[in-house]
Amino acid sequence: MNLSQEDWVAQLGADENAVILDVRTEDEFNDGYIENAVNIDINKGQAFIYEIEELDKNKNYYVYCRSGARSAKACQIMNELGFENAYNLLGGILDWEGETVNP
């Protein structure tokens, strides 16, 4: 499900069962990420699928990438794998107005 930044942040803030998932490359992730995000690179192909399948399907996943395209695809893949609650951040981190962690 696609959510605007406002809705994504509001829903995430009220969700005690939330996981933030960053599907960008490791290099992109290391340039800055949303606090508490877990990085699983969607460009890894089958390895991405394997890592996603290890996640708890009972959690709610708030997914983002650079602009929203890869995270939309990740949410679609997650839905196909049986994850019922995967929320795509429209506009990605490019449009993110919140704070980021810069390692």
Regions found by a protein language model. Name each.
Residues 1-19, 26-60, 66-103:
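Rhodanese-like catalytic fold shared by cysteine-dependent sulfurtransferases
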